[in-house]
Regions:
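Residues that cap or initiate secondary-structure elements
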Residues: 20-23, 64, 93, 120
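Short, conserved charged micro-motifs
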Residues: 21-32, 122-124
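Short, intrinsically disordered low-complexity segments
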Residues: 37-114
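A mid-sequence interfacial segment
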Residues: 103-133
């Protein structure tokens, strides 16, 4: 088993970066709207924390996940990971927690954290394709950095590779 396969089994997180601009409540609303248009429902939104500049998590689920969860014969391993995801939104980012982003030429803090992206390749690819149409300068990172161009190339290449987030975008 390769290291990448181990991560797929164990779980991995991913980050989103933005250069030079602080994220706002409007940015969060746009992110929620993207998931909503993908037929996901959000829970855990705490606008009071946002107004205080505190970070918080939001859980997104779709109808299929909800139906399985509410089923009397519910089995945890029967759920498709592409049916749910948790993100953490950081409205007041600090540069000392940043990453050097080559395409941006500087160290930039992350403002969005995707918890356990393992098995969520389709969900993330669809989300990022829509997201980068609105924020083309941002950068997504798991192990490698992905720009809008990288995601566009990957999105156009069918069938989608479920493990794309663990591969060097130069190989697309």
């Amino acid at each position: 088993m390769s290291v990448r396969e181990d991560i797929k089994i164990m779980g991995a997180s991913a980050l989103m970066f933005r250069k030079g601009k602080y994220v706002t409540e409007k940015d969060l609303d746009i992110i929620i709207d993207i998931f909503t248009k993908m037929k996901f429902y959000s829970s855990g939104i705490d606008k009071e924390k946002l107004s205080k500049g505190e970070s918080f998590s939001i859980s997104f689920t779709n109808d299929h996940w909800r139906r399985r969860w509410d089923d009397d014969d519910y089995q945890w391993d029967s759920l498709d990971d592409n049916d749910h995801i948790i993100i953490y939104f950081y409205p007041n980012v600090e540069i000392n927690y940043g990453e050097y982003i080559p395409s941006m030429g500087e160290t930039v803090p992350d403002f969005l954290y995707f918890e356990d992206i393992s098995g969520r390749g389709r969900l993330l690819l669809e989300f990022l394709h829509r997201y980068f149409k609105l924020f083309p300068e941002d950068v997504f990172m798991e192990e490698y950095f992905y720009t809008k161009d990288d995601i566009d190339k990957l999105y156009a290449k069918l069938p989608w590779n479920e493990l794309w987030a663990y591969e060097d975008p130069k190989t697309f």
